[in-house]
Structure formats: structure tokens, C-alpha cells
Amino acid sequence: MAIAQSDSEDSELEEGETDLIYDARIDNLCSFLESEIHPLYSLVRSLKKGVAFHHGGLLDVARLEVEDLFVDGAIRNLVCTSTLLQGVNLPADRMIVISPKIGDYELSHFDFLNLIGRAGRINTSLYGEIFCIQLVDEEWAEDKIESNETKEIQSSVLRKLNEYSESVVSYIDVYTEDIIDAQGDLKAVTLASYLRSQFLVDREHYDKIISNSNLTSNQIRVMTNRLEALEDVLKVPKDIVYKNPFIDPLLIDQLYFLVESEGVNKWMIDKYPRVRSGVADPNVEFQFMNYYNQYKSIVTRLDDIFGIEKEINYKEDGVSRKSSYYVSIFKLVNDSHKWMQGRNYRFFIDDMVTKKLTSKGISVDYKKIDGITNFVTTHINTNLTFILVKYLSLWADVVSSFMTEEERTLNAFFLNLSSMLEMGSYDPQVLEVMAYGINRSTAIELLKKQKMKSEQTTWQYLMQYNLDRLSPLHRKYLQRAGFGSSKPA
């Protein structure tokens, strides 16, 4: 779909004239994207033509800047996905809807009305214009606009439970691996795992889900009996399951058993990432390894239990691929380590361009850069800072449960690996700056351009920061957070 702002009066351009609006913020955003993403990134090229695009996979800074520029009228035309339906407040004077679908799914009447409700601005326009583009033999607009369809609100959990009720009941106490071996219905596996978790840590919520479902009384009885029996044999403390409700309790229990039987020392990293210590050989005993190999050992053993690589690469059916680019567990380890070292998106994009294109003699153009960029942003925002973070957080919960309070304090750095990965840095100073509401790329740039003095607190460093050292975009985000000084520090 596309949305646009209109001039107060229609006018025809003279030959050689342009209606492009010059705004230094557009140049600043283009410079940032060329540095952080790639000079051939399509958003750079389109911004220079007065058009932007907007979708959930955009870099956070780029998405926020595009929204600001559109709202302020510096960008008049915006091509976007269904992010408009997901809380992004971008009203427009004119909207063009080119398809009644979100991806492969038909846009519901409710969502369509929500979408077209973005046309018009409460402060400046009493109405907006909506254009629905339809092809011959594919008429849809009139039906959408005139439909009296009502929407019944139902949680996705209930909808899936009613759809896969028999499978969920059968799988409620069965390991995923056994279901796969039996060629069972993988679409019911995640829901069965979630219901196991809710039964163990929030029985009231579990009962509410079940009572509102279409399960028969016999199915409910069978599920309850199996879950009660399961509860009796699990060793993992309930508070660990409670903290990790979207990970299968059966597998959490398996991890807990391994840590308990093998000893915490076999599961606890004790080398620091920015210190040369330990052996680089990955085949030595765990306690002799350097940091990177200890980290790799932990993640690969977590993968053996939880199937992280499969979760990243395959859809819920266990067969369809999420992306044409496959992410091995070793790539996940290496990329997450590089991300915590402070590498930016451009580093990962350039690495893929080299490996997938230039080394194979394939020409580099904007379409290929866009495809790689979309993969890298999804890889970082989903695979690294969501999926892997989820399992590293669980790992920390499990190993710390065997420690004394003093041992937890001594190992605090390693137990916070999930937070470091989510925020994207091993560097305590970067993390401290980010804690003041500064985005990652700006925080890294600040410390690169001006070191923090030993006698300074983080707050003093930010307040006294010399704004002249920064590019306009980074300067803007520092000032927006209430920091920075025009005088040299």
C-alpha cells in the first residue's frame, strides 16, 4: 500500500520544476544508511527521490526517522506494509491500497476498516481519500467497503487449540523429538508445550484457556491427568519454568538434569571475551578453552537439547524454510559474538556480499543488496536478539540455580550474556550509555569519538559530551535524550 500527503492546492509543475522538498534531515538519514547499511540500499535511492518505504524489518533508527519525516511533510509518499495496522500512527491525506492481502493472507474486513481509517488527519482534514486498485476479474474493493461482516475476538491460543485439539491432547506430555519421529502434526507441538508450561506455573490461566475451548470433558480429563503425572516427575524448579514460559518444560528439565549431573563447571563460562586466556583449540576440555570456544560449546549443547537451528530456519510445519539463506548453529555463534563485539549491520552485509556474491563472480546491484539487507536485519533482530537471547536467558537461570549468592555475584558478567546480546555489546560503557535511552549505534559512535574519562560517571560523560564530534543524526538522538554540550569537553 502507499500513503501520501497532498498540497493544499493542486498545481501543475512547469518544465524543469520539481516538487521535491529539500530537508537536511533526509541527507542526514541517507548518510547514516550508507554507512550503517550500504550505499546501494534502496531506501537511500528512494529517499533522494522524495519517496520512502516502511516495514517491520527496517532498522529502528531508519524506521523512526522515516515516520518523523513523513509526519512533518518532508516525505510526501510512503510505501508500506501492514505495519500501519500494528500501532504505527501515520495518518495520511491519501491512501492507495493495491491488494487486499497481508502476505499470502486475505485482509479481514476489520483490518481493512482499520487500515483505511488512517486516511485523513484529525487536526487538518475532516476526510481523506482512499484509492483501491483492482485488476480485471479480481474485483474486491466494493465487497470490502460495503461488507457488514462482524469480528469475533478470539485469542490465537484458543483458535489453535480448537483447530488441533486431538493432536494437542495426544502430545501434552510427549517430547517433540518423539513427535517428529512418529511423523506427527508439528503445528500442534508449540501449543502443547505452552499449555504444559501454563499448567505448571499458572494453573488459573491454564484452566481459563481450557474452559473456553471446545475440548470435550473427556479430553480435558485426559490432559489434566497426564499433566499432573508429568508435574510429579519433573525436577526443574517451577520458578525457572515460570521465567521461561515459551520454552518446553520437558526440555528445560532435560537441561536442568544435565547441569546437575555434569556439574556447573562444565556449563559455566569463566574466560572473558576481551581478554586473551585459554586455549584456542575447540577439542580441549571445556575448562581449558578460551572464551569463544566456551561460548560456542554452550550454544551448541543448547542446540542439541532445544533444536535452536531448526527453530531459526524452519517454519512451524518443520519443513518450509523461513529464508533462502540457511543459518547454521556455528554461524549463529559467530554472528552473535561479532554483534556483541560492537559490529554494525554494514559489517554483516559486507561479509555476506563477499561470500555470496563477489567471491562467486556475481555482480552486486541494489536488488541483491536489498535482499541481503532484509536477511541481515531479520537475522539480527529475530535470530540473535530474540531466539538466541531466549535460550541464553534460560541457560543463565538454570546454572545460577545451582550457585550461592556469592557465586552469582562473581559470575554476574557471564550470567548477563543474554542482556549483552539483546543490547548488542560486551562493553560495559556502551551498555551504561544505552541504559540512558541512547540507541546502540549512537552509543557506540559516542564512545568511538570521545572516550569516557576515569573520573566521569556515565551521566557526566553524556551531559558534557561535545556535540560537534557527532554526525547530525547521532547528535539529534543524544540531544533528544537531554544530553550533550556545545562546548568542548
What is each model feature region?
Residues 1-77, 92, 103-110:
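Conserved C-terminal RecA-like helicase domain
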Residues 87:
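N-terminal nucleotide-binding beta1-loop-alpha1 segment
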Residues 90, 94, 101-151:
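Conserved segment of the helicase C-terminal RecA-like domain
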Residues 126-225:
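C-terminal helicase module of SF1/SF2 nucleic-acid helicases/translocases
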Residues 175-202, 212, 231-489:
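C-terminal accessory/interaction regions of large nucleic acid-associated machines
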